[in-house]
Amino acid sequence: MADLGVNIAGVHFKNPVITASGTFGFGQEYARLYDISRLGGISCKGTTLKERPGNPVPRVCETPSGILNCVGLQNPGVDAFVKDDLPFLEKSGTVIIANIAGSAEEDYVETVSRLNGTSVDMIELNISCPNVKEGGASFGTSAASVEKITSAVKKASEKPLMVKLTPNVTDITEMALVAESAGADAVSLINTLTGMIIDINTKRPLLRNNTGGMSGAAVFPVALRMVWQTASKVKIPVVGLGGITKWEDAVQMLLAGASAVQVGTASFTDAFAPLKIIDGINNYLDQNGYKSVSEIVGKVEPW
C-alpha cells in the first residue's frame, strides 16, 4: 500500500482528500454515515464573526452537471463554532480547517484572532466575499485587496494560512502570486464560478439573489487548468478543487500539481464520494508501482 500522507504548511494529512467548505457542514451529519477519521481533513462551513441567517430562498438550483447556490454563508458565527462544533471536530481524528469569511478586513482579523489558541489546525481564507467598504467587489478580484487581506490575516493568525482563490478573475496566477508574497502558506482553488439561470415562464432568475456560485462536474476542466497554471508559478502548496466527483479527477489534479484535493458538491449526490476517491487514489498508486502520493504531484507531461 502506497503512502498517502501529505504535508501542507507543516500540517500532516493522512491522505490528500479533504472535504470542501460549504458541502460538509461541520461533519456531524456525515459522521452518522461513516468514520470521518478516514478523511485527510475537513474544511468547515464558512464561518463569520457574527451569526448569519443566509440569503432568502430559493437559493439552490440544479444545472447540467452541477448546481448554483447563493446560500449566503449561513453559519452560527465564530464563537458558536468554537463552543458547539469544535469539540466534536476535535474527536474526529482528522485535520480541522476553519474556513473564514467576512465583509470587511476587520471582520476577518477578529474572526481569525478568536481561533488562536484553539484546536483548529489551519485557516482557509475565503476571499470571494464582497468587500462592503470598497463598493461590494469581491476581495479576491483585485490584486491590491488580495495582498491587503492576506497580509492582515496572516499577521493576526497563529495558524498556517491557506488562501482560497476565486476563478472570477482575468488571471488567477497573479492572485496566487500576490497571496504568496503576502504570506500565504498555501492556496486552494477554485471557488465557485458565478452563474445564472432564468425561468422562461416566470421570466425570473431561479435564485432569489439572481446569480450564484456554480459548482459540480461541469467546472472541473476549468479548475484543472487553473490548478495546473498556478502550480507552475507559485512555490507554496496548491490544493485543487472544483468539480471533483471521482478518483480519476483527483489523480488529474495531483498530476497537474496539486498537493491535495478537496471534494465538495460530489458529496451531495454520493455521501461516500470522498472515501471512494481515497480508495481510488490508493489503488492507482499501487497498480502503477508508486510508493507515495507525492511521486505523482506535478508529473503531467504537457505537449
Segments predicted by a language model, with ranges:
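Predominant activation on well-ordered alpha-helical scaffold segments within soluble catalytic domains
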Residues: 31, 79-82, 86, 109, ...
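N-terminal capping/small domains of soluble enzymes
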Residues: 1-96, 102
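Alpha/beta enzyme core
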Residues: 103-239, 245-256
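Short amphipathic alpha-helical segments
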Residues: 30-32, 55, 112, 200-201, ...
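Glycine-rich, proline-tolerant flexible connector loops at the mouths of alpha/beta enzymes
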Residues: 46-73, 127-140, 192-202, 206-211, ...
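Alpha/beta catalytic cores of nucleotide-metabolism and tRNA/nucleoside-modifying enzymes
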Residues: 214-235, 239, 245-303
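Short, surface-exposed connector motifs at secondary-structure boundaries
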Residues: 11-14, 91-96, 156-161, 232-236, ...
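Hydrophobic faces of well-ordered beta-strands that scaffold small-molecule active sites
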Residues: 4, 17-20, 40-44, 96-100, ...
